[in-house]
Amino acid sequence: MTTRTQALVPIFIAAVIIGVVGLMSIPSESKLESVEFPRGIIMIDDVPLEVQIADTEPRRVRGLMFQDQLPYDQGMIFVFDKPGLYSLWMLNMQFPLDMIWFDEAGKIVHIEKDVPPCKTPLEIASCQSIVPEGHAVYVL
């Protein structure tokens, strides 16, 4: 029993350290509960989708962090100033998501399906950053 406890103590300490480092790496503006997102409607194949608009750096950093759910007919659209290879990750998310990158003309340049959230200390330490295959200005 003592050897098992001795083996688990360093693992527990490492998990706590990873969790603290992960939380410290979240920019302060994303931790604020009062981040407000403008809302809008976009059309995907003639189907309306209500979206929260992440069009500033603090809004993009915060994204859907700490949100418990997202109704099927809603989403968040990340809007960037110019085309680029904008990567996203699922830090402090509570549910998996599909991600779609669009170019300036609205053409799909990349899709990632069922991306898992990173919410435990071990998941946060190895949270994957998804990079699109093409330049985009919008990510849904």
Give the predicted meaning of each segment.
Residues 10-23:
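Hydrophobic membrane-insertion alpha-helices, especially the h-region
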Residues 2, 6, 22-140:
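Compact, glycine-rich, soluble single-domain proteins
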